[in-house]
Amino acid sequence: MLDFNTIEKLDGIATPFYYYDMDLFRKTVDHVAELASQHDIKVHYAVKANVERRLLEYISSKGFGADCVSGNEVLHAHDCGFPADKIVYAGVGKSDKEIYNALMLGIEAFNCESLQEIYVINEMAHRYGRKANVSVRINPEIDAHTHKYVTTGLYENKFGISQHEFEKLIDILKKSENLRFYGLHFHIGSQILDMSVFEAQCHKAQEIVDDLRGDKGLCLEFVNMGGGLGIDYHNPEQNPIPDFEGYFATFEREFRLPEDMVMRFELGRSVVAQCGELVT
């Protein structure tokens, strides 16, 4: 973070510019990587949080996957060192061209936001002789207790498939010969500081996972709990690194993960926001 000594060193540089505290950035990424290993979880970095090449190259070097929400993000992440088999393509606005490019690149999976999108990916995979891994984003209808513009898990939000669509979803997946159902994805919002919200997410996810694996008979390899962990904008110098330990521990405590499944997270703002400042 900027201090008086650093500000003096930057004197004379034309503004505006972004300043990155690379020491804090590396400490944050290393801390998350260490916790991920301890808790036996997988982390994908949400590329939309910051696409600066030097940051992405370091994150990829630590074994993170990449969560992308545009075709250009997919290509950029791959160019910055993320292996194709660690890239997940999410987002509500995938074009046919972007889907084609991702198929040809051989990405790990498409994270689908609607039944219509699943139809399109299956048809394109069939056309080009590919088999695509797909995960499905579920709208759990949970209030994240955050700003209305960054909540994503309520019924009225545009993201994900609602539970009343599950029967159609299962029918599509069973009939789609060019798709391999890979896992479930939940993400209820951003800048969440109330851990009880994540507890509620765990309980809802447990209900859905148990239902799909049990009565519905679907095979799931992972559950992606999303991100959303907030950072301390009020006391950034006292709390430069978010409480990742408490965050991961909440999910480990509140969600009973089946032995044959992996728990994933997609962290974005919480990894990079404290490390960058706009200087004007």
Where are these regions (language model features)?
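Conserved radical SAM core fold
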Residues: 52, 73-75, 96-98, 140-155, ...
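A charged N-terminal "starter" segment
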Residues: 1-132, 171, 175-180, 207, ...
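Short acidic, glycine/serine/threonine-rich loops at helix termini
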Residues: 56, 79, 99-104, 121-124, ...
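Glycine-rich tight-turn/loop motif centered on a GG-T
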Residues: 10-18, 104-109, 148-160, 194-198, ...
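Short beta-strand segments
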Residues: 46, 133-139, 185-187, 224-226
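Histidine/acidic-residue-rich, glycine-tolerant segments that coordinate divalent metal ions
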Residues: 149, 153-180
